[in-house]
Amino acid sequence: MILSKLITKKPDLKVLIVVPTTNLKEQWSEQIDDLGYSLNCEIQVINTVVTRDWTVDLLILDEIHSFLSTTFAQVFVKVKYKLVLGLTATLERLDGRHEICQKYCPVCDSVPITECIVNGWVSLYKEYLVLIDVDDIDKYK
């Protein structure tokens, strides 16, 4: 994990991990506990982060595609950071707002989905094409 390497080099690093859900907050907490390091680290749900100002050395945004709505993009204003790491498996958005990510947190590395599946980082999945009639869209507006 990137955090363990950073902590060995910079043990005083102040880290803020931002997640979209409480489930992910719990998962991160468990993973950090498993590292066995004492970290100067907070894990917060995005709704909490955008309500106040923060100053950290490292900002980690898990599921960064979730932070690109107008409201949640405020994380880039509310948090003062030296380094930022965004994590996602689905960066591109139909509304084009993934361009915000390129401004604040440009892609520096990616892993092909085949490698992720082989290593057990993602589960097997199926893609389905679901055709809908334009009239159906109007029904649900």
Language-model-derived ranges and their functions:
Residues 2-32, 71, 93:
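Conserved Walker A/P-loop ATP-binding site and its immediately adjacent core
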Residues 2-4, 30-34, 56-57, 73-77, ...:
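Short, glycine/charged-enriched secondary-structure capping and boundary segments
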Residues 8-10, 36-37, 51-54, 76-81, ...:
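Conserved catalytic network of the ASCE P-loop NTPase/AAA+ motor domain
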Residues 14, 40, 55-58, 80-86:
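Loop/turn-to-beta-strand initiation segments
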Residues 18-55:
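Inter-Walker segment of RecA-like/P-loop motor cores
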Residues 41-75:
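Conserved RecA-like ASCE ATPase "motif II neighborhood" in helicase/translocase motors
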Residues 65-125:
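Post-DEXD/H (motif II) to motif III coupling segment of the RecA-like Helicase ATP-binding lobe
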